[in-house]
Amino acid sequence: MIGVFRLESQMLPGNGKFERTGLNSDGKCKEAANTAFNYLKANGNRISGTISTTTKDYIINYQDLQGIGMTEKLALPTLIALCSIALGKPTLSSLAVLGEISIAGTMLKVDELANALQVCLDSGAKKVLLPITSAADLGTAPADLIGCFNLIFYQSAEDAVYNALGVE
């Protein structure tokens, strides 16, 4: 089942700790969140030279808004949340983030794209961040469903962050 999740982030002075709340004991979810933080530590300077993973502590709270269980596809949304708080830039309003990244930044396409878009619509999203690798699957979704969104394609993890934050 496809769900809706909200991430809320906080940044504090510190020494590079990353705390995740709301994931309970789900190891795969924690691993996905850690993937994002490790990616940021290794590649943050490619996003912005002002991001510090050594002098700041980060906290992200994960909320399952529909109570269906937490998704394991948290690396990309976590990376976007971390960059948002680190740069002091909010994400675009009414944005849904689809897709996932690996530790190396490889984009993973969206499973069940038509169903995922329907959940986005039902949840009030107006903009959908989508990996370019899923563009070929748009034919599986009804045209009137696709027409409900401003689709924003990304080609890399950095591109996804820039697009989510509305940075050119």
What does each of the following model-derived ranges do?
Residues 1-168:
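Peripheral, non-AAA+ core regions of ATP-driven protein-machinery
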